[in-house]
Structures are given as structure tokens and as C-alpha cells.
Amino acid sequence: MQLSFTQKKNVRKSFGKLAETLSIPNLIEVQKNSYKQLTDFDSEAGDLSKGFDRVFKSIFPIEDLNDKATLEYVSYRLEKPKFDTEECIQRGLSFTSALKCTLRLVVYEIDQENNTKDILSAKEQEVYMGEVPMMTDSGTFITNGVQRVVVNQMHRSPGVFFDHDKGKSHASGKLLFNCRVIPNRGSWLDLEYDVKDFLYFKIDRKKKIFASTLLMALGLTKSEIADEFYDKDTYSFDAKTGKWKTKFNPENYKAKNFSEEVTDAKTGNVVIKLGDKINFLTAKKLASDGLKDILVSQESLIGKYLHNEVKVSDDEEEGTFGIGTELNDTIIKQILEANISSIEISITNSINKGPYLLTTILNDKNNSKNDAITEIYKVLRPGEPPTVEIATQIFNNLFFSSDRYDLSDVGRVKMNSRLNLECSDKITILRNDDIIAIVHKMLDLRDGKDEVDDIDHLGNRRVRSVGELVENQARIGVYRMERAIKEKMTTLDIESAMPQDLINAKPLTVSLKDFFVSSQLSQFMDQTNPLSEITHKRRVSALGPGGLTRERAGFEVRDVHPTHYGRICPIETPEGPNIGLINSLSTYAKINKYGFIESPYKKVLNGIVQDKVEYLSAMEETKYTIAQANAKIDKSGKILEELVPCRENLNFVLSNPSKIDYIDVSPKQLVSVAASLIPFLENDDANRALMGSNMMRQAVPLLKPESPLVGTGIESDVALDSGVTIVASRDGTVDKIDGKRIVIKATEETDFTKSGVDIYNLQKFKRSNQNTCINQKPLVRVGDKVKSGDIIADGPSTKLGELALGKNVTVAFMPWQGYNFEDSILISERCVTDDVFTSVHIVEYEVMARDTKLGEEEITRDIPNVNEEALKNLDESGIVYIGAEVKAGDILVGKVTPKGDSASGPEEKLLRSIFGEKAIDVTDTSLKMSRGSSGTVVDVRVFNRHGIEKDERSITIERAEIDTVQQDKIVEEEILERSIKQRANQILSGASLTKKIKDLDEGTKLDLEIINKININDVFKITVGNVNDEASIAQLKDQYNQAKQDIQERFEDKVLKIRSGDDLLPSVMKMVKVFVAIKRRLRPGDKMSGRHGNKGVVSKIVPVEDMPYREDGRPVDIVLNPLGVPSRMNVGQILETHLGWACKEFGEEVKRLVNENNKKFEKTEKISSFLKSVYGKEVFDGGIEKLNKTEFSDLCENLQNGIAISTPVFDGAKEKDVSEMLELAKLPTSGQTNLWDGRTGEMFDRPVTVGIIYMLKLHHLVEDKIHARSTGPYSLVTQQPLGGKAQLGGQRFGEMEVWALEAYGASYTLQEILTVKSDDVAGRVKVYETIVKGEENFESGIPESFNVLVKEIKSLALNIELN
């Protein structure tokens, strides 16, 4: 068992029975891979070019209107972003990269006589095309200094879909089938039946036209259409017998059970007598017996349909029977009278082939391709006179031109698989064959030979990730650019122009910026804690442009579908109107190149599980039988059970191992990251698990994070992939460390052109998007060896590289004086005094000094009419000190604004404008601390416009930043020198000096100690008489100089950025941001929750001495209501409590053993045997036994708080395991114990369930919600107080509250509340007067809302007058 750097500090015992064959893929790779494909330029890519390359190729080459010039696209590149992510967040900038394109302008000379073109000139130039937002390493975008996430969108895949109206269109309830071809870009094509079974088509939901018209427009004639879709029989009239002769076809007898009399044409014998029963098998036997031609009576032709046109006279209207005419006695008589002895009949019957297309052809008045195209044109462009040329061009552009129509490679793949076509996925327009195949399918559907598609199947829904969404947006910008380029090409002198002159970069930049700022899918990142970040990046939304809307989405779309298995989590989705529309990707899910979600499976051959892992999409999966991960398997991989529960074609079945094709990779591949963090998920009701996984995202990072004693084993994956921790990028040794940075010397680096040192700057007390605190703490010591990928610093809500959202607290499930009624929570005062649930929140205050009409605002300490006490926290520049304790109303930044002096006359104004005298009067517009909050100033940032003189504070901040960068530079140079000297030692060790250097005499033997004492420049002067060694030293000198120069350049670049002015909004001269840290202790009214959806509100904080306590006197921390468990069916919390209790007791035992050993954390026989009994032999021998002295000491220190365990979802500890753990911890296996009442000292009547539960404090803090209204604003119309904390609103006294007072008969109180306390304007004034005068009488008048009601009734033309 290989332990990582952080795992050695806190080893988890796992209850998982199944070996992990596939580690969880990087949790944010969905975002990163998608955007990488957009921005990576691969010039060697032989296949379809990706990303921006594809975008530019979609419009280039651009030709001018006279064919004199073309602008061609060659390649593109993205420059390095100007500022790094940290600088962008600080300065409020967007993290973008400049997009440069190499374009070639080719100008032609046209020879009018010979009609030829010769190239006159070709100019190539790199042109700036705009700014492209770049993705940070953690999968986010920074727009205007704010971190945003682009959510993946689930939408209907392009392709062809068959469906029916579920019998709703017509009163008869008949199923009307329809089909829709959805392209990625272009017009939609629909085909549908009506009640009379005619087949129609529509383009873009316009008026419907007969489907035969579409086929004729493709170039088929009516008879070719009949031949394509129907087989035919030829009937010829035999005058001798008066019967019709035709070939004997057994197929015709499929639909009939008994038939008319049939005579063998050759012998004249009756082979089938009238009334004989005959079916397909009998008919087949007759054919094999030699029956070839038969004679049938005229009755058997009636009801059949003509396959070809039959002309019986020269009359235009009446003389022709068209294709699809249904035969009857009259028609047959007319045909015979016209001396037509042979006719062709389409083979139709009620089972195999209905005559739907034939009747459609018959009713279609169009007869030629031109007629058909003209009719389509009339529908597309009603009111415009049609000409055949224009109509043909428009029809061809609809579906058959790659400029206007694009199925996309996905659409082509889907269409090929649905219609069984063989066609390259490079062909992304419709072909005639596709439309013909679709009509065939429509006929099959009506005949019951095929089934409609399930639109909620994940094979028919695909995901658009960031890359694709941004690419589509870029395409919009580029199309706008194309129009502008074409205009410029005609107006400019093209021969002297350069590519630069034709390009305006604005449209692309604006288009991309719009998307990131205002699109529904570009969202403000949820940064409450690391889990909420990861979940946000893995979210899949069905809403957004081109998706569904909440109102239209029905139940089916929101429901869990069998294909969600292993792709989309069935548990994690919001409660409320978005339920089921916003989902989360499952743990192992990936998105393939076509945008379909795939899930991994292990191959099974002949009942033996292979190591090979394959990813399957929902379409592929339906072909196979797939077993679940917990099927019993022996060491060799053989499946042991005779019948295994499997999934096959969306159903659950029991299958024989030999028939199984695949097996799940892990039981947790079913659920999302958040759901797989819930231990004993399998014992919780789904609704409560949903609440649990949603509430974990709302947990605020606490002051002292603590990872759960009962975890699921993926806490470390979340902490690692979320990007809040610091991960070592290379192997190395920790060289220097303090609270703000870690310096690691890379051990493997021998190339001095790369830096040999990694400096990791830690984030200290930074503000997150949700005002929670981001703070990183080092986990390493000087001298520690770290490997690439090790976590070297914890971030918010992480402890030792594991996710730590809450706290392990001792819980008792029992009622306590009604204080835990209705899910309320009773908490011990210890949790407040020891800062167990204390969190730090950081609020940003911002003030701007603008240039106004009356003069410039000024940030200063010199504020009129403010006493010195109020300015005690401000420095000489008028800005608050870092570290100052501030409370509500305190000045953070002093600012004065010129006051408009309305009294001054025109003379004064003139003089003032001439002599530039300052505005005489100023008002105090200082930035003050908001009401109801107090805290400590943790950071101040000052931004100055370019060219504005900096104040003292700005210069101080600037110096401090330059000092930090200087320190980094010094450290890098030190480590570089050390590395160079070590390399020099490898070359020169043991050699003797041939020439004196400084204090070293000739002949001195060189070693590392001596080389380290010499100045680095003298090292390069060493001569030892060996040409090769001296050449190596010279090479080393070059490498050193190059590396030192790189360090110097980086330093100068950073200093330049620090010193340069800031880009501020127009008219803003200076901006100051103040960050205040507010400490939030637990208070009654705060919302708390466990991981199982067991949420509640703190009702009372009880002194420790009053809490229930155990036999040894230890009080519990939290008391929950036992009635909250049975009806909610989240029993997982009880199992967690039992197991947590055992873990805690193990910690107590470790503490006891350490105390026995004089409080030394050493490996003694007792500690070793105890740990072996808990962890088991395998884990102890494979991991813990191998730890060195320091590592073992660290482990023991951490284990004193409890031995952590992991119980993976669906593969965790069973009831038996929990009992065994309790036994091992010498605790009652019932999990219950006697408690004593802290107030009386008496024992409670019966044992109580006690243990350790993991509780979270949620981001619904009472301090943010509680408020009181004194006097405040009123609504203008109703004259009632506004609502809500932001408006300083009042408390709503609604309809039901009125009923309550009516029920009590409290009429005076009620009258007061509805009038003078609310919207009786005159009454309010009178009440105020009586209070001022000290009187006690007042009367109520008419409430304003009554007047509003009267006005509304008057607006309905009903006059009301009051007497």
C-alpha cells in the first residue's frame, strides 16, 4: 500500500471490499479538455481542424465583389496573457490572450479578352484579431476580476428523430407519426402524417406540403417514386376466360387468411377454391410445387392501386388515371373499353406496406421537378413572384449547401446509425439518399415495422461543453467581421492595401465578451467551499440558449432515465423549479468527441473479468449485457455467481456469467462527487440524500477545519482536483518556508535554462465570490522531500489534503425540554468558546474618486465637521490602516466631494474658470462600514489612473509588493548558485588547482566544502589542467549567466507591472478597495446540517454544565431530535454516529498509550499492536510499519483525535462491521449508553444513542438575515413599507395573519396594523404628532391600499363614490 505525503500524516482504514482498478479521472478535466481543444493550434492535424482554426476556415478565403482579390487565412496563434490570474483578480481585469492571425491578401489582374486571372501580388501579414478569454488552471474564467464558470449544456443532438403525437392531435386518438431532421446550423425539415394518412413535409415549421413534392424537387418523377417505395405486379386481361392473369406471388397472401378462387393459368385447374383457408406457408408450398402464373377474377383487383399512369382517352381531366388510383368496377371497365389489356398494380396490403405514399402522389397536383420547386418557393417566400432559376437556387441552398446547412459530424453519425447508411462523417449536408431513407422509415413506422425514438435517451441528448459554446460564439463574431471585410475590399484601393487595413477586431472581441458577461451559461462561480467549486464545473444544464425553458419542461425530461446510469447522477439536482433540468456528471463520466457522455466498464470474456477498461456511450451500451461492480469475483477475475444481476437494453435482468460483456468499474460510478461524499448513502432515502449533497455545497469554511472521522475515501480527490490546495509541480526538497510562501529546490532539474527552484506563494485571507475566506497553510517543513503531485499546503475547508467541510462533534439523539422540536438543534457553549463552528467572512468595500463637473473628488484625512476620534484609524492619506478593528459607521476611507454653490453668480463662475480656484465648499462622502457589522481590516488596495500623482499609501503598498518580488529573486539566485556549485563539484571533485585563486593556493584539492566557500564568479576561473573539465566549467558559466538573466528579466517585468498605473473607468481618478474580515461565531438562528439531509436551525446554546453528560463526566456537544430519523428514512446518520463513536474511542486509546509512554510519540510494542488490530495486518505492514520515526510521530499526534475510516458508497461498512468496531473500542454494540442530566444530575430513564456525527455550518447565517425597521422607505403606489433587508423593509402582515387576529377578536390591534402602522398616510402623521405631544389619542383613517383598489375598479369603468 503506497501512502502519499499527506496520507502518511493521517492513515484512513477503508471498509471497501472491491479493489480500485481505475482511479477517479481529474474532476475538472471536462472543462479543461474542452477549452484546450478550442485554443490548441495543431498545424499537423490531418483530420477536421478544431477550434479557432475551424472558425476562421468557415469564412476564409473572402473574395471581393469584383473577383479582383481574395483574403486567405494561413494560421493563428495566441499570445501569452499580459497579466497572470492573481493580478487580474486584484486589478479587476479579464484574463485574456491576444489572438493573432496570419492572413494573405492575394490581388489578381484580370485579362478581359482571354477571360483569365493572373496573380498581381500576394502580401502576408500577422493581424490582431481581438482578445480571447483564457481558462485558468482550475477551469474558471476571470472576467472583470471575477471568477466565472461556463456550465455544460445538455441539448438535443443533431440528427434525425422519429416520434408520434401520443394520439393528442385528433379526437379519434390515432397515432400520427412525425419525423424531424435537426441540423447543427440551418433549416429544420419535418415529415408528418395527417389523419387521412397523407404524408406531408414542412420546412422551418411553415405551411405543410405533400412529401411527394419534396421527392419530385429532388429530381424523381412520380413513377420513379412509386418504383422506389413499392414493388409491382403486372395484371393482363385474358379475354378467353374473362379473368386477369398475373404471376403467383406468395407474399400477397401474408395479410389474408382466406381468399377468392385462384386458377392455374397453365393447366386451367382451380388451385384454391373459393372460401379455402390459405396463408403464407400454404402459398409458398404451391409456388415450390411449380405454380407460376395464375388467373384471378376481376373482384380481386378492386381496392388495389395503380402503379403507373393509365390513359383511357384524350380528355385532359377525366381521361387519365394517375398513380395511386384505387381501382373499382367502373375504372376497370373504362380501362378495358380503351383496349388496355395490361396494367401494373402496386403491391400493398394492410400488414406489410400501406398505400400512404401512393395516395399522397395521387393528391399531389404537381407533375414535374419545376412545379415542385416552385411550390416550395411559394411557401418559403409567400408573395414573391417565382422564377424557376431563383426557386431552384433557394431550394438547393436549403439543405444541400455547406454554407447554409451543417448537420455536424455528430448529426451525420446519428443519422447513419438511425437510417443504416454508410456515409462519411465529413459529409455534413443532406443527400437525396438521406431523404429517401427517411421516407422509407416513415412508411415503416406507419406499418408498425419500426419504433419511435426516446428523446430522453442519452444517446439522443448531447453535451455542449465550454469549447463548443465559445466556438459558436466566436463564429457569430467572425461572420460579422466577414461582412465588414467585404465592404472594405470594395471601398479601399486593394492593390496598395495590407491585410491589416481590412480587419476590424471589434466584432470578435465584443461577441466573446458578451458571452462571458451575459450568457445564461456563463455563471458567477459558486466558491463557498472546494466542493461547490468542483460541482459547479461539473454541472450539466438543460436550460440556456437553444435548450429548454423551465415552464415548458415536462416531467419526462426531468425524470431519471435508465441511460443516466454512470453518466448523470440520479441524486444531485436542485430542489424547486429547476429539479431535473440541472444535473451533475457522475464520478467517472467523460464526454466524448461527439459530446455524448461515456461511462467506463471492464471487459468480460467467457465469465472472466479483464483488466482492460473501455468507455461506452449510451448508444453503444444498449447492445451489451453489463454486470454491476459488486458481483462476486474470485482472485483470477472469474464471476462466481450462477445468475448475476445485469443491465441489458435498459432493463434489469438476471444473466449467466458467460453472456456478460462488461462489468461496472466501481459502485460509485453511479453517483456524482457530492453524493459519493455521503457515507452510508445506501442507507439513506433518495430525497434526503439529494438534500445532503446540495447542502454540503453550502458549508462555510471554518476557522479550524477538521476532516470527517467517517469518510468515503474520495475526500482527498476533491481537495486535490479543486485547486484550493497547493500541489508540488516537481520532485524536490523544501528549502525555505514561512506563512506566505514555500520554496522548493527541484532535485531532478539539470537544465539550467529552466528555473531550478519552485516558489509557491500562498493565498492569505483572500475573499471568495461568496465572501468566505480563502486562506492557505503549509503542510511541509524545511528538508521534507516532496514528489510531484503531493499536496504541500492546505486551502479553505481542507485538512491534511482532505476535504474538511465541517466538524466531528459528540451527538446525543434525545429530546431536551422541547428545544429540538421540529428539527431544531441544541448546541453546547463549548462549540462557541472553543471556536468549533466559527468562520471568517471577508467583505470588500470600494470607493472611487471621480472627476465631477464641479471639480475633482479627493481622498483625504481632512474631512469637514468630523472629530479626531472618528479619524483614529486613518493614515495621513485618509485610508484605514491594515489591522484596524472597525465597527458599524466607522470611516474606512475619507473622501470629500465639491458641493454645488448655487448662490454664485456668473461673474464668480467666470473668475473661477479663469483662475481655476478650487470649489469653496466640500461635503463628506466618506466610505463607512455598513450597519450591523464589525471586523478587522485585512487588506487595502489603491488604484491610480495613469499619470496621476501617487499618495503616500500607494507608494507604501507598491514598495511592499516590490520587496516580495525582490525576495523571490534573491532566493532563486541563491538556489541557482548552490546548484551550479554542486555541478561544478561533480566535474572538479578531487582535482588540484593549477593556478592560485583568491585565498586558495596552487595545488589545493577541490571538494564541495571548498567550492562552496568561493564566490560564484571565481568558480568559473578555476583551472585544473584538464581541457575537458575546463570546457565543462565554461559551459556551466554560460548556463549560469543565461539563467541569471532570465531571473532578472522576470523581476523587471513584475516591477514594471507593479509600478504602472491602472486602467480605471472613465472619469475615475482613484479607487480604493478595503477588505474587512468578519468573525462569525455560532448563534441561535444559524442553519446547520449533517451529510444525510438532516438539517436544522440552532435553537439554543446551552452552558456546558447543563448539557447531558456520560458516565465519565464528558458532556455531549449537540443534541438532535430522534423523531427526525424514522419518517425521513435517512438511517445513514445513525450508522455514521455509531461508527464515529468507535473511531473517537480509538483516538482516546492512542492518547492513553502515548501518555503511558511519557507523552512521547514513539513506536512502542503496545501502540503498534493496537494500530495493527484496528487497521488490519495488510494496511499496517504495507504502510504504517514502513514510516520513519518523524512520520510515525506525526501520525500518532493526528490519531489522538480519532482514527479516521472510509466507507465507500455502496461498498462500505455493513451492520456487522459497525458492531465489530464498537466491540473493538470496548463500547456497547447497541451504540447506546446512559446519560445524566446536566441540570439535575439525575440519570435519564433509558439509554440514549450517542456517538460522533459530522456537522456542517451552512451559508445561511442569522447575522445576514436578521434586521429591524425603525423609519424607512415606503412604496409610492401603495404607501406601504418596502420588504426585505436591503430596503430596510418591514414585516409583512399577510392574509393569514389577518385571519389569526380575526379569530382572536383583536379588532383594535387589527385596525391599527392595517391602517396607521401600514398605509394610512394621514393617520401616520397624526400618530407621530401625538407621540411628540405626549398625548395618547389618535384615530385611523382610510388606508391607501383601499384608494388603490378604488382606482383599479375605476379602470374597469365602474365608478365608486364614497359618502
Curated annotation (Swiss-Prot):
Molecular function via GO: DNA binding; DNA-directed RNA polymerase activity; ribonucleoside binding
NCBIfam families from the UniProt entry: PRK00405.1, rpoB
Family annotation (PANTHER family): DNA-DIRECTED RNA POLYMERASE I SUBUNIT 2 (PTHR20856)
Lineage: Bacteria, Pseudomonadati, Pseudomonadota, Alphaproteobacteria, Candidatus Pelagibacterales
Protein name per its UniProtKB record: DNA-directed RNA polymerase subunit beta
Catalytic activities: RNA(n) + a ribonucleoside 5'-triphosphate = RNA(n+1) + diphosphate
Keyword terms, alphabetized: DNA-directed RNA polymerase, Nucleotidyltransferase, Transcription, Transferase
Pfam families in alphabetical order: RNA_pol_Rpb2_1, RNA_pol_Rpb2_2, RNA_pol_Rpb2_3, RNA_pol_Rpb2_45, RNA_pol_Rpb2_6, RNA_pol_Rpb2_7
Function: DNA-dependent RNA polymerase catalyzes the transcription of DNA into RNA using the four ribonucleoside triphosphates as substrates.
Quaternary state and interactors: The RNAP catalytic core consists of 2 alpha, 1 beta, 1 beta' and 1 omega subunit. When a sigma factor is associated with the core the holoenzyme is formed, which can initiate transcription.
Gene field: rpoB
Gene3D superfamilies: 2.40.50.100, 2.40.50.150, 3.90.1100.10, DNA-directed RNA polymerase, beta subunit, external 1 domain, DNA-directed RNA polymerase, subunit 2, domain 6, RNA polymerase alpha subunit dimerisation domain, RNA polymerase Rpb2, domain 2
Source organism per UniProt: Pelagibacter ubique (strain HTCC1062)
Documented EC number(s): 2.7.7.6
Family, similarity comment: Belongs to the RNA polymerase beta chain family.
GO CC annotation terms, alphabetical: DNA-directed RNA polymerase complex
One of the GO BP terms on file: DNA-templated transcription
